[in-house]
């Protein structure tokens, strides 16, 4: 078993253990502050382990290797870093409970599908900067999508209290505690749009830098393929959302729907399409 697979498996185990600890805190009503501090330190350790696993997998001498699973894992890892930094300002444990399983799953996928491809022209610093910007944007969009799911659940609980009361049995009780312990929706919405603004900026930079690289390599501004189309659709979706937010004050369910739609497009732009090609169609 190769070192990258071992480290990705260890990172998946670390994320899983943290998820269990955090879940048990809500299930048994343990003291929030004490467990929260330990969880933050544990999450930082897991992020460092995950980052080392990615370093071992992606960097090969002066070349770069990437696959759909590695791209997803890198995006989630970058999202984890952003979440950890955000947690120093505002604690959103419900989002962490969504992120930890996502982190574990992304690491396991790398271990299960270890096939990588060399990235063309990876020695060019411009290509590396473009990849970093694109993957950072993917990671931030992933964070935004998971937060949108959490906010949708909180919104439903607030608007349909009778339905929430009927579901308050067993697992529903723990989920109710988790949702009730989250910051107000207004505070979460501010965090959500801050993340979306940064993601949109990085996505814009990735599109522009990708265009310049394409012109230098092929003479074309943008290749007409699924990756370009879905990336532009995601960029357009988030652009419309931000314009609507500024001009019409869009928020709440409209903002959440646009966020999830933009995430769906960004997921299809590389990870989804490469999964179909590499796993289902068995092509490199």
Tell me the role of every PLM-derived stretch.
Residues 1-15, 137-141:
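Hydrophobic transmembrane alpha-helical segments in integral membrane proteins
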